[in-house]
Amino acid sequence: MLMLLTFFAEHMTPLNVFRYITFRTGGAMITSALIVFLFGPSIINSLRVRQGKGQPIRADGPQTHFKKAGTPTMGGLMIMTGILVSCLLWANLASVYVWVVLLVTVGFGAIGFYDDYLKVTKQSDKGFSGKARLGIEFLIAAVAAFVIMRAGQEPFSSSLTFPFAKQFVVNLSWFFIPFAAFVMVGAGNAVNLTDGLDGLAIVPVMVAAASFGFIAYLSGNAIFADYLQIHFVPGTGELAVVLGAVIGAGLGFLWFNAPPAAIFMGDTGSLALGGMLGTVAVATKHEIVLAIIGGLFVVEALSVIIQVGSFKLTGKRVFLMAPIHHHFEKKGWTESQVVIRFWIVAIILAMIGLSTLKLR
């Protein structure tokens, strides 16, 4: 919306600053952070009153988690509010990529909200039907993938690129839609599985958002894209503004989610943020790089798949508890040790992922 001020730049030169993605990214970050900081306490109090007992605690979980009983969930509402308001102010709303990413965020967030609602009202960790939930997620993601493919430039709009072999490109044709949908849904649910300890998910999400904000800016700039030999995708640079809003909202949320958490992100936030990251990766043609930068989320998801698969096939569990962060708690790590060490892993993986931009 503030981009409209550039129409008056001819008479007021300082307004030209709103043309710069970097300036608007910073503005979006500050705005979303302030929104969450200022309105967070009232939202938390309202959710605490409405939810009563708060998010149910897993009976088979670590004993230290029972003291968290009564903590409200659906903190993702705070995050999404900050992101949406900030993007409406600072992003170029003429960009189809901005709208696609925001619609996936809201769509996945709505699914997560309904899941959280069922868990709170039933006081059970069994929420929305898994099959129905995945079905709706794939439907939303498939629509988003179709729009991204049609908005791109042929033949690269339906292609898959590889970070360490930049000249090797696979044209997926119409198979791009189910592939892209899988990336979005997988990212959403991987972040969802990671969100199990105070502050555990939000920092790696911010690290990934910062990394992909950088990637989006480079991918949307013809000069930088040519220099780095990555695919130039016109318009994706605007996604840096959206991801700046994610970082700001994440910082605001972390203020309240730091241990002991005053509120949990819930599926409302984790599904929305994961789906957003997956959509950005698809739009910028860096799906495989997402698996590196978001490697922590991948490991968390794989630990659940391995645990469930092993138990069904052999009757034995590979981990003491899944997702894997609970395994380390059962091994004797304190919650703070798990969280901070996982943050470190996320930062290292992000640096490795970003290094692929230069490696040929």
Swiss-Prot record:
Q: Identify the stretch annotated as signal peptide in this record.
A: none
Q: In which pathway does it act?
A: Cell wall biogenesis; peptidoglycan biosynthesis
Q: Which residue ranges traverse the bilayer? A: 27-47, 71-91, 93-113, 128-148, 168-188, 199-219, 239-259, 262-282, 288-308, 337-357
Enzymatic reactions: UDP-N-acetyl-alpha-D-muramoyl-L-alanyl-gamma-D-glutamyl-meso-2,6-diaminopimeloyl-D-alanyl-D-alanine + di-trans,octa-cis-undecaprenyl phosphate = di-trans,octa-cis-undecaprenyl diphospho-N-acetyl-alpha-D-muramoyl-L-alanyl-D-glutamyl-meso-2,6-diaminopimeloyl-D-alanyl-D-alanine + UMP
Cross-referenced InterPro entries: Glycosyl_transferase_4, PNAcMuramoyl-5peptid_Trfase, PNAcMuramoyl-5peptid_Trfase_CS
Q: Name one Pfam family in it.
A: MraY_sig1
Please give a single GO biological process term from the UniProt record. Answer: cell division
List cofactor names only. Mg(2+)
Main localisation, per the record? Answer: membrane
Its GO CC terms? plasma membrane
State any single GO MF term.
phospho-N-acetylmuramoyl-pentapeptide-transferase activity
EC code: 2.7.8.13
Membrane topology according to the record: Multi-pass membrane protein
Q: Which CDD domains match?
A: GT_MraY
Family the entry assigns? Belongs to the glycosyltransferase 4 family. MraY subfamily.
| Function (record text) | Catalyzes the initial step of the lipid cycle reactions in the biosynthesis of the cell wall peptidoglycan: transfers peptidoglycan precursor phospho-MurNAc-pentapeptide from UDP-MurNAc-pentapeptide onto the lipid carrier undecaprenyl phosphate, yielding undecaprenyl-pyrophosphoryl-MurNAc-pentapeptide, known as lipid I.
- State the protein's name: Phospho-N-acetylmuramoyl-pentapeptide-transferase
- Native species: Brucella anthropi (strain ATCC 49188 / DSM 6882 / CCUG 24695 / JCM 21032 / LMG 3331 / NBRC 15819 / NCTC 12168 / Alc 37)
Record lineage? Bacteria, Pseudomonadati, Pseudomonadota, Alphaproteobacteria, Hyphomicrobiales
Gene that encodes the chain = mraY
